[in-house]
Structures are given as structure tokens and as C-alpha cells.
Amino acid sequence: MYCRRSQLKKPSMSHRTHYYWIAHQGTPLHGVLSIPGDKSISHRAVMFAALADGTSRIDGFLEAEDTRSTAAILARLGVRIETPSFTQRIVHGVGVDGLQASDIALDCGNAGTGMRLLAGLLVAQPFDSVLVGDASLSKRPMRRVTDPLSQMGARIDTSDDGTPPLRIYGGQLLRGIDFISPVASAQIKSAVLLAGLYARNETVVREPHPTRDYTERMLTAFGVDIDVSTGCVRLRGGQRLCATNITIPADFSSAAFYLVAASVIPGSDITLRAVGLNPRRIGLLTVLRLMGADIVESNRHEQGGEPVADLRVRYASLQGTRVPEDLVPDMIDEFPALFVAAAAAEGQTVVSGAAELRVKESDRLAAMVTGLRVLGVQVDETADGATIHGGPIGHGTINSHGDHRIAMAFSIAGQLSVSTVRIEDVANVATSFPDYETLARSAGFGLEVYCDPA
């Protein structure tokens, strides 16, 4: 059954309706597109505003399932949040010591960022909490966060295999630590820094590779004194946050699908407005340019403390490349889109050092390799990457594994298919990009949404 857009306004993986896409060749992409607000920044903005003294206004908030889950949890903890419009939030902060206990488990849905950051916040509270998630989030590793928090004096229980739910015991006295992160992860860093706000003395986080600095930039915007140097962040405990107004830029990870689509669909010429270009987020932009993409920045400025620019993208004949391993942490969420760009390019594209893809919402490495093979693309899989051999893209049915980024990536592949590509289990796109189909079709995608009773 074909589904009207109104039926898909707020789909959920818990619904009994099964949603799928049929993607096929459309027209060259054209137009000026406004991408929704950055998901990572939206999580942090509403969370830090809740901890601030005073009232904060957030513009450009991402209205999606993941960010709604975080906002709903904060409301459950006693924070009053108003929604004057779809992309605005007015947050009446309660201060660092004003959160209240919840009498039910706090449901993060599919939001891994929300769960990990909230863990860092809740370990410092005087009350117990339980963080739960959906089936996908309940399979994701959490010890990488709970271990350093435990070193700070927190008490957290996970399931036997280190996955959610997280049972957090309040009333613990936290101490600052000098933590060397075993992996490059902004979520780990952010959880430790949030706990560090409540800890005695100084908290230091050292990283093997610099990661996204959204937390550092936003804490500064809220008046927190934080020292940042290459690969190292220092935070003194006991500081308070001051309310401020935040304008959130467009999400680069969401823009990535249009960057790739316009680069590989002949005749395309689009402009993406006010896209966030955090230096630790734009590895894909660098790699696409290495492949010969025609992407031009203009109107560069700062928005919400983040570098922002308009991006004009025109079709170009891409060439395969070897992805520099030092860029992998800066594009970890964009690899599904890159794999499709590689399939459309001439020659081979080699990815290595990307084992982290196996512990995202799905095993993204396996999902992309399997899906491209279904479409007739030659791909050689390794433990931490793959070699993609560019060539014609065929037709077939793709299992997205309920992963929003896998689904959106293969919608691009469908535009290059000799026939059609059916993409199963796409409701979870609402976690990050609820209006994806509407925007894609307006730009020229051939993309229909269907639903069947499960």
C-alpha cells in the first residue's frame, strides 16, 4: 500500500506497520535545500540548557525521535520545556542541582548519544535512575562509558554483556580523573565531562585522535571555563551554567546524503544552506574532494558557536581513492553514504581502520557490503573496512536492519539503479531525518514510501 506523507509524520520502530521504500531513477537534483538541525548539537543544547540557571532559547532544534527522547527524559526529570514552533525550544533551566527523580525508567529510544551523555549527567545526581532503549540501542556497548564513570566513583550496572539497560545509583561523591580514552569517541569524552561538572578537582580527558568538540564549544557558550588543547580537555568541577540562546546549524551527517547524491547523479546542481562544518565532522567532505567532487563553500560564518557555510554541489565524475585512516573518526557516521559514492566511482575505493562501524545502530560495515553485493557491486570485506569496486548498480531488495543511515544511503543507490531498489524497514529514518522522503522527492529523487501491516 502506498503511504501518504501524513501517515509517516512520526513513524516508530515499535509500530506494527512495516514501512519500505522503492527507489528508482528520478531527475537530476536541483534546488536550494534546508537540511534539519544537527542531531548531536540538539541533544547537547537541550541538556545543557536544562542544567543552566535561567531560560534558554534554542532555534534550529532537530524535531526527530532521538532528540524528542532526550527532551522527554529531561521533562521527566523536572525540566519545563516549551515548544513554540516545530524547530524551537524554550528551556527553563533548573541549575546543576535542580533535577528531580523519575519514578519510571527513562526511555532513550534509539538515541545512543542521549543515553551516553545522560549517563554522565545522572551518575552525579542524589537519586537513582534507569536508562533503557529500543531493541537496537539495547545491543550497543556501554562499558566504554560506564568504565571511566566508575573510575570517577559512580555506581552503574549494565547487562552481563555491557549493554543497556543502565541502572545508575545516585548519591555518589565523584572525583576528577585523568582519563585516557581507548577509542576516539566524542560520546565518551562528553559523558566524562558532564560527570566532571559535579566532581571534586579537575577532570582530564585525553584522546587517541581529536573528536568532535560540540560539548566543549557548547559548555563555553553556557559560561563554563574549559581548557582545550590538541587531544586533551580539562574541566574544573563545581562550575555553574548560565542560560544562553543557541542557533543550531544544519546537520552535516544528514547533508552527507545530498552531497553524495548530487555528486553521482548526472546533471545535478544543488545548494545546501547553513550546514555545520565542525572540523572534526567533515572527513567525508575531504574524501569526496579527493575523489574529484565539485563542492564549493560560500557564506561561511559562525552559528551557535559552530562554523557554518552554504555548500553548492554539482555532478562530477568521481574516482576511487584510499580513505586516509586519520579521517575515519571524522566521518564515522558518513560511511554508508561514502560506500555508495565509491560504488558509483571509477576504480577502487579502499576503507580501513573503520571497525567502529560494526557497533553502530547496526553492523554498518556488514550491512553496506551485503547490500552493495545484492545490487551487483563487487566489494571485498575486511575486519575493519572494505574495498569497493566501482561499476554499474543493479536492482534488488535491501535489508536496512532498521538503521536510518543504511536506508538513506541505499535510496541514493536506487537513483543509479538499472531498475528499482526496494529498501526494507525504513521507519527508523525518523530518528534523525523525519522529512527525508519529502525533501528528497522535492530535489528530484525517485522515491516512494509504502506500508504493509506487519
Curated annotation (Swiss-Prot):
Cellular component aspect of the GO annotation: cytoplasm
Recorded metabolic or biological pathway in which this protein acts: Metabolic intermediate biosynthesis; chorismate biosynthesis; chorismate from D-erythrose 4-phosphate and phosphoenolpyruvate: step 6/7
Residues at which phosphoenolpyruvate binds: 39, 112, 140, 187, 364, 405
Principal location listed in the UniProt entry: cytoplasm
Localization of this protein: Cytoplasm
Catalytic activity: 3-phosphoshikimate + phosphoenolpyruvate = 5-O-(1-carboxyvinyl)-3-phosphoshikimate + phosphate
Single GO BP term: chorismate biosynthetic process
PROSITE patterns given in the database record: EPSP_SYNTHASE_1, EPSP_SYNTHASE_2
Binding site residues for 3-phosphoshikimate: 39-40, 44, 185, 187, 333, 360
GO molecular function, one term: 3-phosphoshikimate 1-carboxyvinyltransferase activity
Annotated active site: 333
Record keywords, A-Z: Amino-acid biosynthesis, Aromatic amino acid biosynthesis, Cytoplasm, Transferase
Alphabetized Pfam families for the sequence: EPSP_synthase
InterPro entries: Enolpyruvate_Tfrase_dom, Enolpyruvate_Tfrase_sf, EPSP_synthase, EPSP_synthase_CS, RNA3'P_cycl/enolpyr_Trfase_a/b
Domain of life: Bacteria
EC number: 2.5.1.19
Known role: Catalyzes the transfer of the enolpyruvyl moiety of phosphoenolpyruvate (PEP) to the 5-hydroxyl of shikimate-3-phosphate (S3P) to produce enolpyruvyl shikimate-3-phosphate and inorganic phosphate.
Subunit structure: Monomer.
Family of the protein in this entry: Belongs to the EPSP synthase family.
Protein name as catalogued: 3-phosphoshikimate 1-carboxyvinyltransferase
Species for this entry: Xylella fastidiosa (strain Temecula1 / ATCC 700964)
Organism phylogeny: Bacteria, Pseudomonadati, Pseudomonadota, Gammaproteobacteria, Lysobacterales
